């Protein structure tokens, strides 16, 4: 069905907890128990898009921008959003959106833009902070491997391009089982000492529930001891914008002309040219001007985004070349990400 095969694939790639606080990514309209008859992939849901899905007999629309942002007290067709909702419901069409969760995800929107430009050594420009937890538990020696494996499968232990990361320390645990318990080892009413392994690992905060479930399913104790510690570490694989390098430096004007052609931009606005060579490129699809200070701090030669406010040009014109290609133009290739995920 749509939920098990398509929505789950989208959310594995771009988990909903990665979306920004203002966002409304995820299921917008419809029931996901049906089998998909076809999927229409788009940047924005419009009436024309819903009409096309109806004409083609498709029952799924996947968009980058959410159709619904604000709350509605009634849906009676007052604007295009309400009309899209009504038409989708009438024709049993599911609408699903992956927005800032896809922007922030590894391999997401900004990575696709970087791919089109030809950047190498691409990394997150503004990594997320306070998204990670340290997890610690204590397991009898003989069961440590099984528990550790379950924790990794639940989402623990990923650091950069490494997985199954943990630190393990042998020690001794003590406990006294009370009346009414069924201890795995030791006797009721007697103090027991057990050789145990302290397992330390790391996880995204949104996987906490899955990790607890995995621990309780595999740990031999009735009451396993475990702790979560909030971390201040940045999560370098997740965040806003990216920065990378061109294979060879390019003249400013040549680079801008190539961007204009690659993204089919009618009018590419930019700050004045200074004659610098372009090699380090920072970018953010959509309205990304908030990342200009990060781009400057990264020593990028140019910052490319979809929307820039008037005064942002003046604030940074002496520090970096700023280029604005248009919101749609910057994110148009998001459809290719959707296609790769669900095909």
Predicted regions: what they are:
Residues 3-343:
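Active-site catalytic microenvironments in core metabolic enzymes, especially phosphate/sugar-handling
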């Amino acid at each position: 069905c749509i939920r098990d095969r398509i929505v789950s694939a989208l959310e594995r790639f771009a988990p909903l907890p990665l979306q920004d606080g203002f966002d409304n990514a995820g299921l917008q309209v419809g029931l996901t128990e049906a089998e998909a008859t076809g999927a229409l992939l788009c940047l924005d849901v419009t009436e024309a898009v819903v009409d096309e899905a109806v004409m083609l007999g498709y029952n799924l629309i996947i968009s980058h921008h959410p159709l619904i942002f604000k709350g509605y007290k009634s849906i009676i067709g007052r604007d295009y959003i309400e009309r899209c909702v009504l038409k989708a419901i009438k024709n049993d069409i599911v609408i699903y959106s992956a927005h800032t969760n896809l922007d922030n995800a590894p391999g997401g929107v900004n990575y696709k833009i970087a791919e089109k430009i030809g950047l190498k050594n691409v990394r997150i420009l503004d990594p997320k902070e306070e998204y990670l937890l340290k997890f610690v538990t204590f397991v009898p020696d003989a069961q440590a491997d099984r528990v550790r494996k379950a924790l990794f499968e639940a989402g623990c232990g990923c650091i950069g391009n490494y997985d199954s990361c943990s630190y393990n320390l042998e020690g001794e645990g003590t406990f006294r089982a009370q009346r009414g318990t069924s201890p795995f080892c030791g006797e009721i009413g007697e103090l027991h000492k057990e050789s145990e392994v302290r397992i330390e690992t790391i996880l995204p905060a949104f996987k906490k529930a899955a990790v607890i479930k995995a621990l309780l399913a595999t740990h031999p104790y009735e009451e396993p001891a475990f702790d979560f510690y909030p971390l201040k570490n940045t999560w370098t694989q997740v965040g806003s914008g990216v920065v990378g390098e061109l294979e060879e430096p390019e003249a400013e004007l040549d680079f801008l002309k190539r961007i204009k052609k690659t993204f089919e931009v009618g009018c590419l606005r930019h700050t004045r040219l200074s004659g610098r060579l372009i090699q380090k490129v920072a970018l953010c699809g959509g309205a990304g001007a908030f990342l200009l200070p990060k781009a400057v701090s990264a020593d990028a030669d140019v910052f490319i985004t979809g929307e820039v406010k008037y005064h942002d040009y003046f604030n940074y014109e002496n520090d970096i070349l700023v280029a604005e290609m248009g919101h749609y133009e910057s994110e148009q290739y998001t459809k290719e990400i959707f296609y790769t995920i669900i095909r």
